[in-house]
Swiss-Prot record:
Region Disordered, residue ranges: 157-476
Domain of life per record: Eukaryota
Protein name per Swiss-Prot or TrEMBL: Acidic leucine-rich nuclear phosphoprotein 32-related protein 1
InterPro entries for this protein: AN32, Leu-rich_rpt, LRR_dom_sf
All copies of domain LRRCT, residue ranges: 131-169
Alphabetic keyword roster: Leucine-rich repeat, Repeat
Biased composition (Acidic residues): 165-194, 222-232, 252-289, 299-329, 353-371, 379-396, 415-436, 458-467
UniProt record similarity statement: Belongs to the ANP32 family.
GO cellular component, one term: nucleus
UniProt keyword annotation of Repeat present: yes
Species assigned in the record: Oryza sativa subsp. japonica (Rice)
GO molecular function: histone binding
Amino acid sequence: MDEAWERAVEAALQAAGEGSSSPARSLTLDGAVKCLHGRLPAAEILERYQSLEHLSIAGVGVASLAGFPRLRNLTRLTLSDNRIAGGLDHLVAAGLASLRDLDLSNNRIQDVGDLSPLANLRLVSLDLYECPVTRVKDYRSKVFGMIRTLKYLDKMDADENERPESDDDDDDGDGDGDGEEEEDDDDDEDEDPGSGEVANGGVSHPRGGVASHPVEVNGVIDVDEDESDADEVVPNGGDEHHANGFRVAAVGDEDEYVEEEDDDDEEDYEEEDDLGEEIDEDGDDEDAVVEVHDVPSSSDEEEDGIEEEDEEEDEDEEEVEDDGEEAEPESSGRVALAVGDVGEEIDGHEHGEGEDEDENGEIGEEDEERLEDDRVYEEGNDDDEEDVDDEDEDTEYLVQPIAQPQAMAVGNDFDAAEADDADEDRDEVDDDDDGGTDLPSSSQGAKRKRDDDPSGSGDDDEDDDGVEDLRPFKHH
């Protein structure tokens, strides 16, 4: 078993480039040997390298730290991915006074008390990832309280701020980092921007830019698309001459494009003006020119209102004419009634026997009076028609753009016509009353006639009955 560890150590040193001429400072044995019994190799194999500062034995299945080698200069120890559950006091017994960084992640440490031996070491960083102890309540505060020198637990400080990378390189506290930082400095020196060397055959300028010259291929100039806008800008408004003889102007492409658009617009306007002149010339040749003017909406509304008023007046005139036509049948009806009365009287005379001529003459006078009354009524109707015609003429004469005066004028004329009709009706009633008063005179004349002629008493009685029959009919 020890032989396997010796071969693994020699292979690791050769891979790291460590020779016998210079002492080894770092040794990595991760997974090199599988410990069947969970024990470390013999202490003598590793104690040969007292100059070791970094030792890593991870993933080999170590379960016990008994017999750990004494390495006075060891500052970083990695024992992750093993089966360590306790026995950390063996590290203290090994006299690791320089140890600052201990990695025990992914092991089987379950109790915070198992970490108590580490308080005797001056640890600065302790890693316990994936260990069951990390699930204990207030695990971090307890560990920091136990190990006073500890600054970082699981790569975070007490305030849970991550550990800077510079502290990882300077674990021994002497202020000097490892060789990796020195190698980084060498790489930075190799990439000095002031060397003046530029890839792809470009030429560096003092202002830090790189000017790539255009390449002519088959008469076509190919300019790199990666040219920056800063390279195209010419300082102090001057012109830049390239090596191939081309000159770069300070005017941008956008200004030229805008000027071209302005020229095109001016040409379009000139063409439109020419077309307008041609249209004007053609228009002069035509005799009939139609001009369309926009009429305000208010005037249209007024005209519509006047037309509506005219229509209303026409309707009123038609109604007045209809009233005149209806008045004429009334007059004819009265004449018919008068004629009917006369007819009844005639029938009465026909039925009578032996009436005298004087009696017939009196009845004829009554008929003439009735006919005169009818003529007066007809003349009144004629006057009504003339008034209606005058009203029609007045309405036609009073047509004006204003609606209210016309309506008032028409209304007043109709009121006057109605008043005239009422007066004429009163005159007719008076005439009827006069006709009724004349009837007794005829009856008295008839009585005198009967007194003079006693032989015709029977006929006179019949005549009196006919006259009495006429009275109620007339008054009705």
